[in-house]
């Protein structure tokens, strides 16, 4: 079976392969730091060998709970924010029919998301949609006090109990939370919810392969064994025994750091398949939270091509030359569709008649890459044989491992996120949360 692969040929005109190869000692040292747990954030390295440590029994437990939700729910709401929902959503959206919502007959419960914003309109419309429906909730929160998720869960818990009764609600509400402490744990134990544990040594943005991601993905009807198998394969490929030049995570980390040193401060993750939109969003958090600190870090941006070629294409082609692109390139689509012939040919597209739509998309991808390289934008390609659970597992672990290496190359702690607390403190002060009286006075004086 083929694996995903990284092609950096279109970086050669900007950074030589010899320069990238010279990173080998530094990358090796970073990988040893990860393996030995001697670097910054070493208490959050549970993701490193997670794929190979996941047992068949654990997956069976997750699938059994997922089946309960599938059997009893028309809709399942995944409540979480950031790493507590983006990974699951990335996989689910990548594997789902683009028009799943519109299908008259569903293959399982509709999966919707909450707790990732504080929009009154969104939550009102969600609760209205859930009215009179049999719905369940997967509440994903280590603490149970993250404002966005806790607020959404408070609304959903009440509605679920009101519509289904407390006994059925107990059956269809599942908590993914801390093993022992926190408001979500206390509530789950009190109400008798089924629970799964978020490991203490796995941070949110690295948690896709824990119950945080695996349970919602299983509820959506996708094969979590294959997902883990793909990640397990990439754990080996990206491991310390693989030579530098054959290790895609090592080469990716080295290349992006050299480009950063060369003044390329923005990385744009590109896809040519709209199903990968939320994979882009997951990647943005993974790298943004991991590297954006101490006044350093590549800014992670993302685009959906060819759509965004008609909005961001001009800037990428001719704007400030501080960018590079990484393209997720899918070799084989799931479906086959040919361009028909038209007798009038008013649109002038008969030269495409008989060709697959994917061939047109592939030429758009190739043409874009060449144009951007000519315009001064280095390009890397992550080549993926097809979109399925196995290869998504490979993609997830590849990006996670490269992120750990890249953060250490940059000289930061890739496993903390102190900056995200600043807005919370201000918000709590403005809301007059108990314990924030002094902060409230100080912030009111600034308004």
Swiss-Prot record:
The active site is at 289 (proton donor), 310, 424. Pfam families: PGI (PF00342). It comes from the Bacteria. One of its GO terms (cellular component) is cytosol. The keyword Isomerase applies. It is an enzyme of class 5 (isomerase). PROSITE patterns: P_GLUCOSE_ISOMERASE_1, P_GLUCOSE_ISOMERASE_2, P_GLUCOSE_ISOMERASE_3. It catalyses: alpha-D-glucose 6-phosphate = beta-D-fructose 6-phosphate. One of its GO terms (biological process) is gluconeogenesis. Keywords: Cytoplasm, Gluconeogenesis, Glycolysis, Isomerase. GO terms for molecular function: carbohydrate derivative binding; glucose-6-phosphate isomerase activity; monosaccharide binding. Signal peptide: none annotated. InterPro entries: G6P_Isomerase, Phosphoglucose_isomerase_CS, SIS_dom_sf, SIS_PGI_1, SIS_PGI_2. Pathway: Carbohydrate biosynthesis; gluconeogenesis; Carbohydrate degradation; glycolysis; D-glyceraldehyde 3-phosphate and glycerone phosphate from D-glucose: step 2/4. Its EC number is 5.3.1.9. It is found in: Cytoplasm. Belongs to the GPI family. PANTHER family: GLUCOSE-6-PHOSPHATE ISOMERASE. Catalyzes the reversible isomerization of glucose-6-phosphate to fructose-6-phosphate. This is Glucose-6-phosphate isomerase.
């Amino acid at each position: 079976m083929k694996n995903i692969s990284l092609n950096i040929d279109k970086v050669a005109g900007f950074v030589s392969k010899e320069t990238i190869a010279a990173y080998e000692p530094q990358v090796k040292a970073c990988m040893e730091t990860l393996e030995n747990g001697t670097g910054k954030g070493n208490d959050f390295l549970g993701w490193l060998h997670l794929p190979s440590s996941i047992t068949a029994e654990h997956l069976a437990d997750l699938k059994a709970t997922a089946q309960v939700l599938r059997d009893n729910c028309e809709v399942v709401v995944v409540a979480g924010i950031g790493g507590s929902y983006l990974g699951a959503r990335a996989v689910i959206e990548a594997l789902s029919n683009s028009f799943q919502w519109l299908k008259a007959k569903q293959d399982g419960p509709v999966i919707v998301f909450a707790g990732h914003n504080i929009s009154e309109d969104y939550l009102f419309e969600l609760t209205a949609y859930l009215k009179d429906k049999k719905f369940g909730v997967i509440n994903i929160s280590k603490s149970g006090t993250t404002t966005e998720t806790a607020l959404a869960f408070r609304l959903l818990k009440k509605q679920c109990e009101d519509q289904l009764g407390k006994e059925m609600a107990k059956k269809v509400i599942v908590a993914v939370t801390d093993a022992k402490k926190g408001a979500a744990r206390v509530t789950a134990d009190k109400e008798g919810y089924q629970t799964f544990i978020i490991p203490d040594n796995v941070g949110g943005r690295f948690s896709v392969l824990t119950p945080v991601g695996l349970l919602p993905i299983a509820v959506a009807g996708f094969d979590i064994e294959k997902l883990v198998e793909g990640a397990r394969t990439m754990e080996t490929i990206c491991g310390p025994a693989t030579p530098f030049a054959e290790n895609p995570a090592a080469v990716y980390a080295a290349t992006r750091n050299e480009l950063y040193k060369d003044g390329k401060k923005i990385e744009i993750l590109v896809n040519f398949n709209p199903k990968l939109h939320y994979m882009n969003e997951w990647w943005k958090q993974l790298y943004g939270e991991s590297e954006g600190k101490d006044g350093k870090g590549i800014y992670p941006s993302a685009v959906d091509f060819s759509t965004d070629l008609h909005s961001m294409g001009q800037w990428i082609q001719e704007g400030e030359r501080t960018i590079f692109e990484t393209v997720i390139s899918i070799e084989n689509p799931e479906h086959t569709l040919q361009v028909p012939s038209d007798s009038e040919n008013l649109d002038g597209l008969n030269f495409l008649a008989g060709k697959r739509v994917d061939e047109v998309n592939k030429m758009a991808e190739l043409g874009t890459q060449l144009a951007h390289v000519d315009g001064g934008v280095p390009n890397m390609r992550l080549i993926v044989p097809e979109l399925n659970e196995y290869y998504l597992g490979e993609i997830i672990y590849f990006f996670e491992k490269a992120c750990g290496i890249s953060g250490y190359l940059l000289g930061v702690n890739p496993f903390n996120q102190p900056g995200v607390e600043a807005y919370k403190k201000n918000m709590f002060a403005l809301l007059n949360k108990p314990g924030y009286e002094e902060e409230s006075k100080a912030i009111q004086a600034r308004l």
